[in-house]
């Protein structure tokens, strides 16, 4: 789901049951990235190089723009959905750096995001089955009620924002290394997305887990 043809994704996640969101985030969203690596780079290397500036532009917009939209969301599933678009922006950016680090980082990022986003949708599904609401304002103070759940939620949120030591960090770090080698300006702009990613995930976690009960 690259920007600007990503608008179907948040609504699809909202309407889908938890299992559907898990499959969509963990498997289906990675098919385009696999196609780029398997077919575009392998069969059409010259065309891939020609279209690199366009993919860079779309990737950077996806990273920054959808991260800002995620910061404005009140629906937990929509927030995670927009974060998925931002993460896929990192994937396409890494692939089209045409650098070893960037491509390897994109592969790691796809695997990492598949696992972490699926886990985040499952954590949302756990509380949705009990409260029948996805709105962040509905929740608060969960740490005092279900502390073990809060710990798991924290681990998945930290992995999503790319904390050093998690799989999310490895993928994003390698992608940015490849980007810095190929285009310094694009890499600097994309780095802002790492900060925004931390902002919306910590904002989500704070309001759901440490807000007023």
What does each model-identified segment do?
Residues 1-209:
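Hydrophobic transmembrane alpha-helices and their helix-loop junctions in integral membrane proteins
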Residues 211-213:
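A glycine-biased, small/acidic residue-tolerant capping/turn segment at secondary-structure junctions
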């Amino acid at each position: 789901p690259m920007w600007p043809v990503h608008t179907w994704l948040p609504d699809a996640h909202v309407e889908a049951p938890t299992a559907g969101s898990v499959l969509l985030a963990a498997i289906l969203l990675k098919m385009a990235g696999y196609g780029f690596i398997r077919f575009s780079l392998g069969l059409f290397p010259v065309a891939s190089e020609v279209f690199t500036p366009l993919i860079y532009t779309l990737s950077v917009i996806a990273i920054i723009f959808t991260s800002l939209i995620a910061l404005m969301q009140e629906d937990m599933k929509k927030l995670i959905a927009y974060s998925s678009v931002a993460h896929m922006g990192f994937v396409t950016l890494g692939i089209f750096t045409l650098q070893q680090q960037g491509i390897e980082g994109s592969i790691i990022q796809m695997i990492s995001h598949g696992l972490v986003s699926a886990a985040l949708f499952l954590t949302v599904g756990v509380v949705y089955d009990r409260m029948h609401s996805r709105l962040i304002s509905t929740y608060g103070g969960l740490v005092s009620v279900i502390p073990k759940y809060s710990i798991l939620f924290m681990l998945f949120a930290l992995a999503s924002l790319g904390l050093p030591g998690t799989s999310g960090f490895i993928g994003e770090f390698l992608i940015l290394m490849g980007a810095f080698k190929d285009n310094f300006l694009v890499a600097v702009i994309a780095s802002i997305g790492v900060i925004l990613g931390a902002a919306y995930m910590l904002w989500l976690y704070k309001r759901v887990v440490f807000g007023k009960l």
